Design a protein with these regions (language model features):
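Hydrophobic alpha-helical connector segments
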Residues: 82-109, 155-158, 190
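Amphipathic alpha-helical segments used for helix-helix packing
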Residues: 106-124, 141, 174-178
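N-terminal intrinsically disordered/low-complexity leader segments
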Residues: 1-18, 208-212
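Amphipathic alpha-helical linker/stalk segments
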Residues: 8, 33, 69-96, 111-112, ...
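Generic hydrophobic, amphipathic alpha-helix propensity
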Residues: 15-27, 44, 69-77
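Amphipathic alpha-helical packing segments from all-alpha helical-bundle domains
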Residues: 123-149, 159-175, 187, 191-202
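Alpha-helical DNA-contacting segments of helix-turn-helix folds
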Residues: 31, 59, 63-73, 80, ...
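Helix-turn-helix
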Residues: 22, 30-64, 68
């Protein structure tokens, strides 16, 4: 293959990737006011400026686009957790909540999608989100096992603790999305979030796990 042909192929592939991302971004914008089940293919392609048939070069269906959005949104959630682990503070819980607030503000549309579609009308997307959350729980359980005193915990107990933390985090995300940018409401959400996570942490400290 000549250099020109190779460059042309690369350019076409780059254009295809850009169009695919444009479709995801457009769907996310349109979903700010509705659910995936009510969003039409024509709405998304009109937003991007391509003909409806061109959609199928990138996704087999709107359900497949929704699964891709779920995976993209979960990458945002994972990046937030990595950020929290990478930036230890004197008060780990306050620091984690601060990072959560910051990330929800920066990536509000991703978190809105996860919260709304977790129990939404598209089965493939519900399953994709549930699968991603289970994987997240497994990763967090592995992290918890590295803490002093938790290495000998029963794996089921580690997973239970991880799932509690993930559930707590999602409830905080929902509260942040509901309260919006209002300072007083935000302060109340942060206070409740910190107390909620401290309660989980205290329970973990006093839990007597018996290895099986």
């Amino acid at each position: 293959m000549t250099g020109d042909a190779s460059g042309s192929l690369g350019t076409r592939q780059e254009r295809k990737l850009r169009t695919r991302q444009a479709l995801l971004d457009a769907a996310l914008r349109l979903l700010a006011d509705g659910s995936l089940a009510s969003l039409s293919l024509r709405e998304v392609t009109r937003e991007v400026g391509i003909v409806p048939t061109a959609f199928y070069r990138h996704f087999a269906s709107m359900d497949e686009l929704g699964v891709a959005l779920a995976e993209e949104s979960m990458r945002t959630l994972r990046a937030m957790l990595r950020d929290a682990r990478r930036k230890p503070t004197d008060d780990a819980i306050s620091g984690s909540v601060a990072i959560l607030v910051d990330q929800v503000r920066k990536h509000e549309s991703h978190f809105q999608f996860l919260v709304r579609e977790r129990y939404g009308g598209v089965a493939d997307v519900r399953r994709a989100i549930a699968t991603e959350l289970r994987l997240l729980g497994s990763e967090l359980a592995t992290d918890l096992a590295r803490f002093p005193g938790m290495a000998e915990w029963d794996p089921d107990d580690l997973r239970m603790a991880a799932d509690l933390m993930v559930a707590g985090m999602l409830s905080i995300v929902m509260a942040l999305l509901e309260v919006g940018p209002h300072p007083q409401g935000l302060a109340e959400v942060v206070d409740v979030a910190e107390r909620q996570l401290r309660l989980i942490a205290i329970g973990m400290v006093h839990w007597h796990s018996t290895p099986r």
